[in-house]
């Protein structure tokens, strides 16, 4: 990894007036030019991290670094970051041009340079021609674009976005997800985005930090976090999940619902108690006799792109299935899935333990594969 643009080293935050601990020993490094998301429910600590970077809050302990420089004691206006708030914080008495130009005027930039950079910023956010428009005559999406143009006008090293899409309707929010992601890639500026919406995080991010109760529970790419949740909280917070108690008999073999199934996970103790996760979209409906499991359909809802089916197996476990095929309430159906669809979670495993286990397991697999290849090559040489 190159030198991080932002780094948190053992950062904690306690509100002194009531003793509430909102961040607990946070450590991470952010690379330049990527889109990062802090994802969590209300009170998880995600906005606190954003406010610490911006300088709106002070850390109780630990170091915060911007481009290698410790910024704990650097005032807000001296930090090379800009924040886009949920409310956008635009000046209603100013035009679009005046709002975007405001940070440059504070720095006493020359008039011609202001005009040039405002024009470039408005082009970037597709608001060319709106220079003289008053803020009150803009739609929600247009106001957000103005706020983003103002955020990038000073060419900051980092743009911080505090749930900027939450006030928009669903269609506009989806459109702005594409626009924000495209803008970040064109600018090459590091974006740090805060949201409670897991779909936003999955759609827009290069890297996600899942937060709960003041801690980073898991971090990784959207695919990694969705496909390999570290624990029950992440599995239920990121998407829909079927989660069942299980026993890891040995590498590649897991037992749940009284049956044994092939899996792709390993690196655990023999007969270790675990949990399995199977996503609803990974379950295929079959004839009862052809399924690995048999379940009884209880209810179903049409979600537009699929039917959401709720069923129960003979042990009383509830199953959610996403299928393009309609089921009949009360009927028995079979469920099929592949070893790759079964995700194994250890109980009470930390992210550090999870990462170390995966790394050790991958290295062991690669070593074993290398030995097998060497034996095969030696056998071929002897035969020839």
UniProtKB/Swiss-Prot annotation:
<keyword id="KW-0067">ATP-binding</keyword>
<dbReference type="InterPro" id="IPR013611">
    <property type="entry name" value="Transp-assoc_OB_typ2"/>
</dbReference>
<dbReference type="InterPro" id="IPR017871">
    <property type="entry name" value="ABC_transporter-like_CS"/>
</dbReference>
<keyword id="KW-0472">Membrane</keyword>
<dbReference type="InterPro" id="IPR008995">
    <property type="entry name" value="Mo/tungstate-bd_C_term_dom"/>
</dbReference>
<dbReference type="GO" id="GO:0005524">
    <property type="term" value="F:ATP binding"/>
</dbReference>
<comment type="function">
    <text>Part of the ABC transporter complex PotABCD involved in spermidine/putrescine import. Responsible for energy coupling to the transport system.</text>
</comment>
<comment type="subunit">
    <text>The complex is composed of two ATP-binding proteins (PotA), two transmembrane proteins (PotB and PotC) and a solute-binding protein (PotD).</text>
</comment>
<protein>
    <recommendedName>
        <fullName>Spermidine/putrescine import ATP-binding protein PotA</fullName>
        <ecNumber>7.6.2.11</ecNumber>
    </recommendedName>
</protein>
<comment type="similarity">
    <text>Belongs to the ABC transporter superfamily. Spermidine/putrescine importer (TC 3.A.1.11.1) family.</text>
</comment>
<keyword id="KW-1278">Translocase</keyword>
<keyword id="KW-0547">Nucleotide-binding</keyword>
<dbReference type="Pfam" id="PF00005">
    <property type="entry name" value="ABC_tran"/>
</dbReference>
<dbReference type="InterPro" id="IPR003593">
    <property type="entry name" value="AAA+_ATPase"/>
</dbReference>
<dbReference type="InterPro" id="IPR003439">
    <property type="entry name" value="ABC_transporter-like_ATP-bd"/>
</dbReference>
<feature type="binding site">
    <location>
        <begin position="40"/>
        <end position="47"/>
    </location>
    <ligand>
        <name>ATP</name>
    </ligand>
</feature>
<dbReference type="InterPro" id="IPR050093">
    <property type="entry name" value="ABC_SmlMolc_Importer"/>
</dbReference>
<dbReference type="GO" id="GO:0015417">
    <property type="term" value="F:ABC-type polyamine transporter activity"/>
</dbReference>
<dbReference type="InterPro" id="IPR027417">
    <property type="entry name" value="P-loop_NTPase"/>
</dbReference>
<dbReference type="GO" id="GO:0043190">
    <property type="term" value="C:ATP-binding cassette (ABC) transporter complex"/>
</dbReference>
<dbReference type="GO" id="GO:0016887">
    <property type="term" value="F:ATP hydrolysis activity"/>
</dbReference>
<keyword id="KW-0813">Transport</keyword>
<feature type="domain" description="ABC transporter">
    <location>
        <begin position="6"/>
        <end position="238"/>
    </location>
</feature>
<keyword id="KW-1003">Cell membrane</keyword>
<dbReference type="Pfam" id="PF08402">
    <property type="entry name" value="TOBE_2"/>
</dbReference>
């Amino acid at each position: 990894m190159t030198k991080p643009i932002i780094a948190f080293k053992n950062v904690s935050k306690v509100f002194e007036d009531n003793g509430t601990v909102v961040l607990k020993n946070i450590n991470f490094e952010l690379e330049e030019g990527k889109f990062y998301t802090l994802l969590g429910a209300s009170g998880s600590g995600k906005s606190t991290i954003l406010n610490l970077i911006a300088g709106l809050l002070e850390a109780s302990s630990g170091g915060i670094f911007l481009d290698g420089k410790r910024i704990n004691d650097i005032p807000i206006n001296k930090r090379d970051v800009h924040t886009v708030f949920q409310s956008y914080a635009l000046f209603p008495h100013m035009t679009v041009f005046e709002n975007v130009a405001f940070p440059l005027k504070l720095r006493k930039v020359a008039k011609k340079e202001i005009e040039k950079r405002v024009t470039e910023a408005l082009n970037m956010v597709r608001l060319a021609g709106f220079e003289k428009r008053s803020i009150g005559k803009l739609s929600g999406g247009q106001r957000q674009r103005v706020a983003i143009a103002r955020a990038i006008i000073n060419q900051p090293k980092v743009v911080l976005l505090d749930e900027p899409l939450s006030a928009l309707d669903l269609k506009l929010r989806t459109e702005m997800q594409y626009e924000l992601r495209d803008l970040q890639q064109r600018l090459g500026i590091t974006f740090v985005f805060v949201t409670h919406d897991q779909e936003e995080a999955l759609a827009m991010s290069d890297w996600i930090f899942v937060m709960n109760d003041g801690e980073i529970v898991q971090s990784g790419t959207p695919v990694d976090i969705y496909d390999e949740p570290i624990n029950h909280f992440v599995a239920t917070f990121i998407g829909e999940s079927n989660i069942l108690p299980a026993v890891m008999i040995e590498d590649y073999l897991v037992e749940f619902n009284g049956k044994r199934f092939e899996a792709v996970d390993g690196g655990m103790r023999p007969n270790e108690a675990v949990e399995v996760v199977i996503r609803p979209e990974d379950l295929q409906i079959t004839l009862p006799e052809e399924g690995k499991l048999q379940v009884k359909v209880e209810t179903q809802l049409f979600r537009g792109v699929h039917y959401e089916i709720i069923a129960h197996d003979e042990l009383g476990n509830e199953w959610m299935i996403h299928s393009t095929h309609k089921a009949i309430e009360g009927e028995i159906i079979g469920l099929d899935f592949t070893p790759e669809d079964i995700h194994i979670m250890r109980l009470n495993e930390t992210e550090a333990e999870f990462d170390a286990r995966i790394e050790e397991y991958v290295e062991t697999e690669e070593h074993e594969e290398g030995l097998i290849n060497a034996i095969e090559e030696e056998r071929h040489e002897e035969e020839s």
